[in-house]
Regions:
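Conserved small/polar residues in nucleotide/adenosyl-binding loops
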Residues: 1-8, 202-209
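Amphipathic alpha-helical scaffolding segments comprising HEAT/armadillo-like alpha-solenoid repeats
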Residues: 3, 25-35, 60-64, 145-146
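Structural detector for internal amphipathic alpha-helices that build alpha-solenoid repeat scaffolds
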Residues: 12-23, 34, 45-53, 133
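Amphipathic alpha-helical repeat scaffolds of TPR domains
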Residues: 74-94, 125-130
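Short coil turns that delineate tetratricopeptide repeat
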Residues: 120-123, 156, 190
């Protein structure tokens, strides 16, 4: 019976890892966890090797696309935005080392900075939110603040502009600013749910060490 379970485990793991390769990142975290925690060493080794292949492909494409983003042409802004959108799903999973995660997040915002300087109107609120979240995860509060402010300036009527600032201030331990933004959100015409206004919703974020 255990062999049957092992085969099923390996089959489901293979399916999940293939999802990662195809770019379906919704199931990738489950695949990665399964890879690292599988009791079957063969399965764990197989999954880990597939994951490394995925990450190596990611690093290679990041390098290529980064150079593409430096080319001054009509597609430069679009290339920069596509670069951010490509990087986000992998960075979101936080499967890189802390050092590489931080380096990649920095490169992500560097490229978006280029797009912002050239034609910021083309940057969507969703892209602003992505770069804010990735910078927050690596505790780059200074650059995260910069992008949160830009998001609020360009999209003052969008919920994510407020929630990005709230997450930032909560993580920094800036309680007064956190509740100030929350009150501004309450006073706005933006449709919100109760969860957004509950401080407990932010407790999963990393608090500053004292």
């Amino acid at each position: 019976a255990s062999d049957v379970y092992k085969r099923q485990d390996k089959k489901s793991l293979r399916t999940l890892m293939l999802n990662v390769i195809r770019g379906d990142y919704r199931n990738s975290l489950a695949a990665i966890n399964l890879a690292l925690n599988s009791e079957d060493s063969e399965t764990a080794h197989y999954a880990a090797s597939v994951l490394q292949d995925v990450l190596n492909d990611f690093r290679s494409k990041v390098q290529t696309d980064y150079l593409l983003c430096q080319e001054e042409n009509e597609q430069q802004v679009e290339n920069c935005i596509k670069f951010v959108e490509y990087m986000n799903p992998i960075l979101e999973q936080q499967v890189l080392t802390n050092l590489e995660q931080r380096s990649m997040a920095e490169r992500m915002q560097e490229v978006l900075q280029k797009a912002w300087e050239l034609d910021k109107i083309k940057i969507s609120s969703t892209v602003y939110e992505k770069v804010c979240q990735r910078l927050l995860e690596v505790k780059d509060y200074e650059k995260c603040t910069l992008w949160c402010d830009r998001a609020m300036e360009q999209y003052p009527g969008v919920l994510s502009s407020y929630t990005c600032q709230m997450k930032l201030y909560f993580s920094c331990g800036k309680k007064e600013k956190f509740f100030q933004v929350m009150q501004e959100l309450r006073d706005s015409d933006i449709a919100i749910d109760n969860e957004t206004l509950e401080p407990v919703s932010y407790t999963h974020l990393t608090l500053p060490t004292t």
